[in-house]
Amino acid sequence: MKIINKSTPCFVLMILALSSLFTRTLFAWSTGPEAYRTGAPNDKGTCKDSGCHNSFPLNSGDAKFSITGPTSFAPGETIKLKVSFNSSSGKLHGFEMTAMDTNDNQIGKFKAIGKTTQVIPPKDYRGLKKEDKGTYIEHTLSGNKKKRWKVKWIAPAKATGTVTFYAAGNEANGDGTNTGDYIYTTTLEITAASATFGQ
């Protein structure tokens, strides 16, 4: 008579479940990190702080990570911004960006350009709050094969003062794990144009 260990099927199912969860997590992060990982004030730091890509100190790689755009904007205007890696030897790259006013509150709305960027939707695996809809943008799965991304940002109709864009970037070695990758942060400040008409 063959004796079957009743705990064996449960153990196998547990291993399969954990393996599936690990695979989904790796795939999810390749399609864009969770929200609030730009390094901005009140964010949860970067992907390095989440324990995901923490092999090296922040901004310790040789690449140059930057945000470029206009120096000013008009209230209600839609402007274009570019997030870039230069002098990078990484095989895959990614980013996440948000914009904040002088009181460290999210400001404006982002809009994706093409298929390499996406506005983070609320209430999925990335954990974006409903009230922050439209305020975070990042790479897509196809976008992690790029080193440069263009996005749009729509200023509020009554925007004033200085807006600071915060971005975190991942320079990855493409080995399918979260080790050996460099995380960078950068900022860009632009100012709302003053209304001078009639003066």
Predicted regions and their residues:
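Sequence context surrounding c-type heme c attachment/ligation sites in exported
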Residues: 22-154, 158-198
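Detector for methionine-enriched segments
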Residues: 1, 14, 97-100
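Bacterial N-terminal signal peptides that target proteins for export
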Residues: 2-12
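Bacterial N-terminal signal peptides
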Residues: 12-21
